[in-house]
From Swiss-Prot:
Stretches the record annotates as Disordered: 104-136
Record's keyword terms, sorted: ATP synthesis, CF(1), Hydrogen ion transport, Ion transport, Membrane, Thylakoid, Transport
Name used for this protein in its record: ATP synthase epsilon chain
InterPro entries: ATP_synth_F1_dsu/esu (IPR001469), ATP_synth_F1_dsu/esu_N (IPR020546), ATP_synth_F1_esu_C (IPR020547), ATPsynth_dsu/esu_N (IPR036771)
Length: 136
């Protein structure tokens, strides 16, 4: 028995297939899903979704959204997502370093829309970098 996983973004169907295990980056921490899991709805944080299918792990960078688990079906609706295998690891690392520098440059400044945006870009760059490295 396996799970059916669907990862949907506004512009694409990122993943649609079966999985033995799914680990979601929920807003309250990592959430592991196996067959027979109780039905639930959870908020998804910016992070990496991990999928185990046929003994191997794959990663998907998620940029926030929601997930529903019901009758061994996991549906993840996100703002944006990328398969780890399609992310250029070197470019993701460079984006992460650039975002880290931008956030560090705002250290000690009062809260502002620019500071919030910089932190969000850092979180997204971190997720992309982690997903690209997990794809190896």
């Amino acid at each position: 028995m396996s799970l059916t996983l669907r990862v949907l973004a506004p512009d694409q169907n990122v993943f649609d297939g079966s999985a033995d295990e799914v680990i979601l980056p929920s807003t309250t921490g990592q959430l592991g899903i196996l067959t027979g899991h109780i039905s639930m709805l959870t908020a998804i944080d910016v992070g990496v979704l991990r999928v185990r299918a046929n003994g191997s792990w794959n990663s998907i960078a998620l940029m926030g959204g929601f997930a529903e688990v019901d009758s061994d079906e996991v549906t993840v609706l996100v703002n944006k997502a990328e398969l780890g295998s399609s992310i250029d690891a070197n470019a993701a690392e460079a984006d992460f370093q650039k975002a880290t520098t931008a956030v560090a440059g705002m250290e000690g400044q009062p809260a502002s829309p620019e500071k919030v945006k910089a932190q969000q870009q850092l979180n997204e760059a971190r997720a992309r970098m982690q997903a690209s490295k997990s794809a190896d």
